[in-house]
Amino acid sequence: MLETRCKYYKNEAMFHGFIPHIMGTRFDILLIHSDIDRLNTLWADIAYELERLDKILNRFDPHSEVSKMNNHASQSKIQISKELKSILQLCSYYYQTTSHLFDITLKDFSRIQLHEHSYISFTSPDISLDFGGFAKGYALKKIRKFIEQENISDAFANFGNSSILGIGHHPYGDCWKVSFLNPYNQSLLKEFDLQDTALSTSGNTLQYTGHIMNPLTGIFNEQRKASSILSPDPLEAEVLSTVWMIANEQEQKKISEKFNNIQATLYNL
């Protein structure tokens, strides 16, 4: 059962929901509204949705849908859920629009074969799917819809300080302020003022280096660099923050022309 916690701060009309372990990280959300019952219901819906998505996309869970697909799709056609089919179609779109730098197979997305009636197969036995650079952005997009449906105008959702959505503003400010720190020395790289905007960051750290691979070359990026993407779309921000770590200047320019609402920055650490 998913572990969740929550607390309501009456003076600020602020609800804090917390999940210590989901999608490989922690999740926090702040919801600003005076109706505590409404916020409790919304929080329950969000927590349920995150658990549901994790059961689809978490490749480390042997019972998840993606794990079952990874184990069998290279052997024969298997049927997948309509949502996973839709997700794969989204991934195909980002594969094409990022010059093949976004690739959930880390090898060759074209080896995924989608068939009629939501069946899928892999044309190579060594293909498996990893939604690590997709799932949190996809989840934030879903969460935003829940918040909008409840007509809540101020909220802040945060996956592990790397995938963030700011809606409206903080109770004591005109935006949601987020500091992006250098992971090697904790100095300030940039401060963002989020207002109806998503932020995604990516990069190497002292403890976590060489985890980002260029699918076109098979080479892991071990440079002391980090990236940040601002976008109205949380999923675009998530996808492109990883892409920016491996794209060269020419590729970045080409991709920027297709995503003209983003603000992308690459940092030397």
Predicted regions and their residues:
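Mature catalytic core of soluble alpha/beta enzymes
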Residues: 1-269
